[in-house]
């Protein structure tokens, strides 16, 4: 038997991932509903955004994946195995340890924790003795995959011919499906589904916190002047603005040209920080337990 690699649509290999609004509850809920109906692409792209845009999700998920990847492992023969079979298992274990970076392989497969599944494409080649051996394990983006519409249980490769995609080539893939709950299809088992709303709420809070800082953290500069020429007044205003962000004012009057720095207006931004902390605590509980 000659192992084969999957023929992947070159257009899909050059496909650019879409990015989805991180402040729209309706958009995110629609993506999750589409995945329940068997359309996984948009959800997969959202999950990738979550990993890349939220440092807390990235850090906590990395902790969990590293904890799995660093575990010791071994191959055990069947209890009824004879001496020859036991020796074959020992030889296979030595071959795997000498040939493959299992820690990296397991770390890559652990992406299934968040996404619900992970598929690594195998590239085969012959070794020095002529035996076929896997040469590389290439993690493929989860947006490349779909499920059959009849059962929504069988992971398949997307193509341009059918919404069911095409079957994965035998011996061409290592597929790990992770179950974050007791029932469901591969597209609904990812832990990131539970993190989508905390991720959304944190984005709300972060953007509002940045607006708060912009409004209340910049001193206000006020210049009282007696200049009548509009051109000169505009030049003075530009000079003030060049001193920093636009917390400036140009007012006519006063006894002399006088630059005043006014203390920033008081405000309370703790509510935004509390929401951010709650979202991060929820994420940590979901990923690491607690």
What are the language-model segments listed below?
Residues 231-290:
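Long amphipathic alpha-helical segments
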Residues 79, 141, 263-266:
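Solvent-exposed, flexible loop/coil residues
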Residues 63-67:
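Extended, low-complexity, charged intrinsically disordered regions
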